[in-house]
């Protein structure tokens, strides 16, 4: 883990966060663990508190769920790099936020890889049923899977999650399944406005 971020507000600019699995923990943890003693670490037994995080011009690298947690977070003009550790499948995000939260919002970012095979990297999967990730006006490399997003292993409650996309370009941009919400221009603009207001205090 390169960074554990657990404060009411956080701002990172021009920072490189490099790792493999679980590079950036955008706290808080989910309310409940799935396995006994599954939460070990800071604030594992403390009440959960909402956090708003803002990342600008950052490079974040990893392979499995390398941006994860329950924060409301905005990533602006960042480079999101999947490391090629010769895994059959990789995942960028694993959100676990509240149903009424914002989740992770990526705007004008570059999703690149270290020569990962085409179609082997998912933009995200829900760590908890209400996880959310939105990808807006981003450039996606060929490593991004055509489906875009994935359920969490064999769980059947992923229909509560919200994965959204608008304005994607590049070899990894594709027609997604019905599970991924396609936002129109007005919806994407409103989501970005809300994210900036919450995470940048605009």
Regions found by a protein language model. Name each.
Residues 1-202:
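Sequence-level preference for short, compositionally simple segments enriched
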């Amino acid at each position: 883990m390169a960074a554990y971020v657990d404060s009411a507000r956080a701002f990172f600019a021009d920072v490189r966060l490099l790792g493999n699995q679980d590079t950036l923990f955008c706290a808080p943890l989910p309310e409940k663990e799935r396995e006994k003693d599954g939460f070990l670490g800071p604030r594992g037994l403390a009440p959960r508190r909402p956090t708003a995080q803002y990342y600008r011009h950052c490079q974040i690298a990893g392979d499995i769920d390398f941006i994860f947690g329950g924060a409301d977070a905005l990533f602006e003009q960042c480079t999101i790099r999947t490391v090629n550790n010769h895994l059959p499948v990789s995942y960028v995000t694993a959100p676990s936020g509240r149903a009424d939260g914002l989740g992770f919002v990526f705007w004008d970012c570059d999703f690149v890889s270290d020569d990962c095979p085409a179609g082997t990297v998912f933009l995200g999967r829900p760590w908890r049923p209400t996880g959310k990730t939105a990808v807006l006006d981003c450039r996606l490399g060929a490593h991004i899977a055509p489906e875009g997003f994935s359920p969490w292993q064999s769980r059947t409650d992923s229909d509560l999650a919200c994965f959204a996309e608008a304005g994607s370009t590049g070899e990894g941009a594709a027609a997604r399944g019905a599970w991924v919400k396609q936002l129109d221009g007005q919806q994407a603009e409103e989501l970005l406005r809300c994210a900036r207001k919450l995470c940048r205090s605009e």
